[in-house]
Amino acid sequence: MSGAPSYETRFCSHCATALAMVEQAEDGGPKTRLRCPACGWTHWNNPTPVLAAVVECVDQGNQVLLARNAAWPGRLFALITGFMEAGETAPEGIAREVTEETSLQVLGQSLIGVYEFKRMNQIIIAYHVTARGPISLSPELAEYKLFAHADLRCWRAGTGLALADWLTARGHVPQFIELPPRT
């Protein structure tokens, strides 16, 4: 299948048989997906919902907090992100993520938008979060920086587009940086 993403799931979660690419009739016509040849289970490979936050620190002159993930090479700073937990709403999830990753007290939030991130097979649900308090990073983050709105730079994918939309809604013309190619 041309352009098919690489799959991490290799075995059926019901019977442990090795999965195979099998074409089968679906509502929209025939579709080739990873399926179990023994029991018929289908690995749908649906996009994962990811939460992201433009964190505006109200006790730091409304500067925006960007952080660098400890696993990332170089000095790229981005929005606070994380996965929803079972049983929580997206607003609850982003408040939890911001507090877990930065120790900030979340005061309010509003939806910026929903963005595709095809490379990671994710759907990003982005919020503007107002917060305050001392910043203490979780081990998953290496460092953070606070930026005035005019000093923020966006990137042309995923959460960078959410940051650009947030800036535009506040009357700023987003400035973009070019990220190095992924190797």
Q: What annotation goes with each model-predicted range?
A:
Residues 22-23, 104-113:
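A short coil-to-beta-strand element that immediately follows conserved catalytic motifs
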Residues 2, 46, 57-100:
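Conserved Nudix-box catalytic region and its N-terminal flanking loop in Nudix hydrolases
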Residues 137-170:
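NUDIX/MutT-family hydrolases
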Residues 2-53:
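Acidic, metal-coordinating catalytic segment for phosphate/diphosphate chemistry
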Residues 115-136, 149, 166-167:
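Active-site-adjacent beta-strand/loop module that shapes the phosphate/pyrophosphate-binding cleft
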Residues 1-12, 53, 153, 166-172, ...:
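A broadly conserved sequence feature marking short terminus-proximal activation segments
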